[in-house]
Amino acid sequence: MRNNQPITQHERVYPAEQRLITTTNLKGIITYCNEAFIDISGFSREELMSAPHNLIRHPDVPPAVFAHMWTTLKAGRPWMGIVKNRCKNGDHYWVSAYVTPIYDQGAVVGYESVRVKPTAEQIQRAEALYRRLGAGKPAIPRRDRWLPVLLDWLPFILISQIGFLIGIWLNSWWGFILAGLLAVPLGLAGLRWQKRGLKRLMRLAEQTTSDPLIAQMYTDSRGDQARLEMAILSQDARLKTCLTRLQDTAEYLTEQARQADTLAHHSSAGLEQQRAETEQVATAVNEMAATTQEVANNVQLTADATQKANELTSRGRDIAAETRNAIQRLSESVGETGAAVSRLAQDSNEIGGVVDVIKGIADQTNLLALNAAIEAARAGDQGRGFAVVADEVRSLAQRTAASTEQIHHLIAKLQNTANDAVHTMESGLQQAEAGVQRVLEADSALVGISEAVSNITEMTTQIAAAAEEQSAVAEEINRNISTIAALAEQTSDEALRTAKLSEELTTTAQSQYSLVERFNR
């Protein structure tokens, strides 16, 4: 037997109209408990659920009480009794428990206990019974065993005494004989008459909790009277249990209906919002479809432009090739011109050499003319003609020398110009070669551009196809969203009707709760 500690012997009280409800499986594991039971026990719902019910057992309750309870329940009958339960902190509270088996398809699947607050007198009787059982005394005192029998035979004894008094009054043997003969049948008839109605009641009492042990907790009566009184109390507890469960169910139903009503209103509001947002999505999808179509058109235009760019790139490659060829020809021409200028410079050098020879001859002629003039002067008149010729020759030699000097300057200038031309031609040749290299690089770049444009053209074609497909999908989505919007509107109407039904259900549950509350008092 489980011994839960500690205990404080401090009683917790609760309102008389409060009902404490629990259900267990066949092993006594708690499967349900209402809020009132949780509050008075001090345990949390998590601590109680799936825990053994003897978690709240108080050590002051004798094991015989629980043994009697389980024997009664396993026999398929309800059990009723005053029980002292322990709180989590060691306090206690008294209950008048009515425990019934729970059936499912004819088989017992668990037990249900509905507890109400007992009276102070019932608690005192239960404590007295606990003390007797705890002391090892019999549950039913000996006097309670023979006193009911005496009370049953009391009418027969009284009638016998009346017959005896009649005999004394007649003052004869015939009077005593007559009194004896009348007393026996009258007493037996009275006893049978008394037992006849009582037996019918006792047969009804057998269907309820009428055990003498339990009766001691609820009444001071003895024998059949105690059993009948206990049967009435049991029926009252059974009715209260039924009403309490109806009330508990009505409370749960009311709460569920209230939650369903709230959810229905929220669902209706959500569906209305969904419908509005679906319309916005439909509008957005329409705009997206139009935009997609426009994108498809723009992509097609881009594809056309890309194709033209590809053609222009091809043409640019052709022009680059022609430019490269022209520059190469120009480079060759510059090279040839440079060679000609170089030859001209060489010829100028040769002319310079000839001019130097002529200059030397002129100088020599001038010297000879000077010598001739000297000789003519010596000859006098005979050499005057020769002197004139010598002067002319000297003059011619001087002019030749001057011309030769001019030619020499011109040839030097021509050589400088030719050298500059050669340098310029060499620079032009280098630049032409660099230009050819740049044209080759441009041609390579144009090849890359042409390949990129080809890839862009291919991707643009794919994008155009995807845009067309996306446009078709957008139209399909638009149709689906329109269908969803229609269904959402229909569902919203149904949600409103559901909300209205939930309100009516809440009203009905509240009416049921009020009806049960009127009778469960």
From Swiss-Prot:
Annotated TM spans: 147-169, 174-193
Keywords from the UniProt entry: Cell inner membrane, Cell membrane, Chemotaxis, Membrane, Methylation, Receptor, Transducer, Transmembrane, Transmembrane helix
Domain Methyl-accepting transducer: 249-485
Compartments in which it is found: Cell inner membrane
Gene Ontology molecular-function annotations: transmembrane signaling receptor activity
Membrane topology reported for the UniProt record: Multi-pass membrane protein
PANTHER family, per database record: METHYL-ACCEPTING CHEMOTAXIS PROTEIN AER, METHYL-ACCEPTING CHEMOTAXIS PROTEIN MCPB
Protein name, per record: Methyl-accepting chemotaxis protein Aer
Organism of this sequence: Pseudomonas aeruginosa (strain ATCC 15692 / DSM 22644 / CIP 104116 / JCM 14847 / LMG 12228 / 1C / PRS 101 / PAO1)
Lineage of origin: Bacteria, Pseudomonadati, Pseudomonadota, Gammaproteobacteria, Pseudomonadales
